[in-house]
């Protein structure tokens, strides 16, 4: 094999201490692309040094996100970063793992199989909430037109307590929906079910029940809300429905309060979202949404995509993304099972700090 002066130079570069290298001595532009490449180890160190002053996620007691996964899970996820979650024809087994996760959650939330439930992964609960809201809006619009309601007379509205997460405000702004907020106060640290119907009219696309309010940690009384909605539906042509924002609670309540009725056991709960990167115990970001039946997910919101190699239905706001979080979620379901999640959740019920 022939060698040249360039080989000598390349070899010498590895002998130079990292912080004595030429690349470490030059000023790297912050907001435009630099002219020449640098060695991988130096790029790694420079980026790592940039992050030194940030907080340590493991020490952040205020985070809502999972900050630790087992080495086996981390390894599995790092080995699958390149898989595109939407390319189901190229990665059929990855698609099957997503399908398994959807069915596991549907079973956990008592989805009635006779109504042909469906669901999908998302990049987090915010996207899942957007999808749940869109489904309610499109369904309301179709039903309103069938009733002869003038849908141009006023904007549709969504009813929710003032303990809402900002994604619902985004939903209402992005998709031209009025947000009708039921105030919380000292006597009502969750949705005031005695007043909720005061905010409802025939332009209401649905009511959001929150399972785990950010400010208080409380669950809205979904069973009481369901009874109120059922009574309303008996006396009105306009059908009210409930979406459960279970970003925190939907992966917590089944293990800690299994007798609490908040999910698809209640007839008027039509969709539920949760965050896999909270009590699903997966690194950010992954979320999930399940609809109880076909009629609650309007067909016009489902797109058949064929240009990735095979026709496939997709319901999402985002498109290409790594499948590693989905794979991490299935790993956790497989690894922990019901009893494992129950033990983990029971360890978080009442934390004490002294």
Predicted regions, residues:
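Glycine- and acidic
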Residues: 28-29, 81-89, 113-120, 152-155, ...
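Short glycine/serine- and small hydrophobic-enriched flexible loop segments
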Residues: 107, 134-138, 331-335
């Amino acid at each position: 094999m022939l060698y040249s002066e360039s080989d000598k130079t390349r070899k010498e570069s590895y002998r130079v201490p990292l912080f004595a290298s030429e690349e470490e001595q030059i000023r790297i532009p912050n907001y435009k692309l630099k002219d020449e490449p640098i060695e991988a180890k130096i790029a790694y160190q420079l980026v790592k040094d940039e992050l030194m002053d940030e907080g340590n996620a493991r020490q952040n007691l205020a985070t809502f996100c999972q900050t630790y996964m087992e080495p086996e899970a981390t390894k599995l996820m790092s080995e699958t970063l390149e898989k595109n979650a939407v390319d189901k024809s190229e990665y059929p087994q990855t698609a099957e793992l997503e399908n398994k996760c959807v069915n596991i959650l549907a079973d956990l939330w008592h989805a009635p199989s006779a109504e042909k439930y469906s669901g999908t992964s998302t990049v987090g609960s915010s996207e899942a909430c957007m999808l749940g809201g869109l489904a309610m809006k499109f369904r309301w619009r179709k039903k309103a037109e069938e009733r002869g309601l003038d849908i141009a007379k006023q904007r549709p509205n969504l009813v929710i307590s003032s303990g809402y997460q900002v994604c619902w405000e985004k939903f209402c702004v992005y998709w031209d929906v009025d947000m009708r907020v039921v105030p919380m106060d000292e006597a009502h640290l969750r949705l005031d079910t005695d007043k909720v119907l005061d905010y409802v009219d025939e332009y209401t696309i649905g009511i959001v029940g929150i399972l785990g309010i950010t400010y208080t940690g409380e669950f809205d009384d979904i069973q009481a809300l369901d009874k109120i909605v059922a009574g309303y539906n008996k006396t009105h042509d306009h059908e009210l429905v409930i979406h459960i924002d279970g970003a925190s609670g939907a992966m917590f309540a089944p293990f800690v309060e299994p007798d609490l009725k908040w999910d698809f056991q209640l007839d008027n709960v039509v969709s539920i979202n949760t965050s896999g990167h909270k009590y699903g115990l997966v690194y950010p970001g992954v979320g999930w949404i399940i609809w109880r039946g076909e009629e609650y997910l309007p067909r016009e919101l489902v797109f058949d995509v064929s240009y990735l190699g095979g026709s496939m239905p997709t319901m999402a706001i985002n498109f290409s993304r790594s499948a590693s979080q989905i794979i991490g979620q299935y790993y956790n379901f497989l690894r922990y099972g019901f009893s494992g999640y129950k033990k983990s959740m029971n360890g978080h019920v009442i934390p004490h700090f002294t």
